[in-house]
């Protein structure tokens, strides 16, 4: 079985190889695709910072992940996306599906997927990835409210993002918002998705509330 040290060493090797690739965009904001919302946010969401996405309840966890992936696509047009996922998400919702990710708009070839058993390991891997200047976005998924994910941990992620230019998205399920260094905080619920012409399920839809 791969140890935590081995997993982190493998991630460091991957990030070192990525550093020889495409650098992330230098634009300070990325658009959400809605002019009214972008305007209210001063041009969109800021890159090189930490943003939190909370599921309204555990049942809405897949929607929170989908919304976070949509933000990652917006933030990262071409650079790699590092997705660090606590294994609890796989157990509850199933593993990521390549064709579904592609249908959402993210080329699976740009995705580096890291699975970790504990929240502490997720934070370590996410922090390591956030320090790599060749990464576009880091998506970190953590279940519950572990003690290791405190204000200090969020500050470390925020500072790493600011130093490297990487955008960090933290998806939280079965957790209540608490003090953090996040620039924005969202709450996500599933919404009805229906094609107006056929009445069949259409594009992914989310009910989103900007908490901060």
Language-model features: locations:
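A contiguous pocket-lining binding segment that forms or flanks enzyme active sites
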Residues: 134-179
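Hydrophobic/aromatic ligand-binding patch that stacks against planar heteroaromatic rings
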Residues: 74, 129, 160
């Amino acid at each position: 079985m791969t140890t935590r040290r081995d997993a982190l060493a493998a991630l460091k090797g991957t990030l070192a190889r990525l550093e020889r690739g495409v650098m992330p965009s230098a634009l300070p904001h990325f658009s959400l695709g809605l002019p009214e919302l972008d305007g209210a946010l001063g041009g969109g969401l800021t890159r090189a910072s930490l943003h939190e996405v909370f599921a309204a309840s555990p049942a809405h966890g897949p929607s929170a992940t989908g919304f976070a992936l949509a933000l990652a696509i917006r933030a990262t047009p071409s650079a790699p996306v590092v997705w660090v996922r606590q294994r609890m998400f796989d157990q509850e919702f199933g593993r990521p599906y390549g064709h579904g990710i592609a249908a959402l708009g993210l080329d699976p070839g740009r995705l580096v997927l890291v699975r970790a058993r504990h929240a502490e390991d997720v934070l370590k891997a996410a922090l390591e990835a956030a320090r790599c200047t060749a990464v576009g976005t880091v998506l970190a998924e953590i279940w519950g409210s572990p003690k290791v994910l405190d204000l200090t941990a969020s500050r470390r992620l925020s500072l790493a993002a600011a130093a490297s230019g990487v955008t960090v998205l933290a998806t939280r399920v079965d957790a209540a918002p608490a003090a953090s260094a996040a620039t924005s905080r969202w709450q996500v619920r599933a919404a009805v998705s229906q094609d107006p012409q056929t009445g069949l399920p259409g594009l992914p839809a989310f009910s989103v509330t900007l908490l901060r």
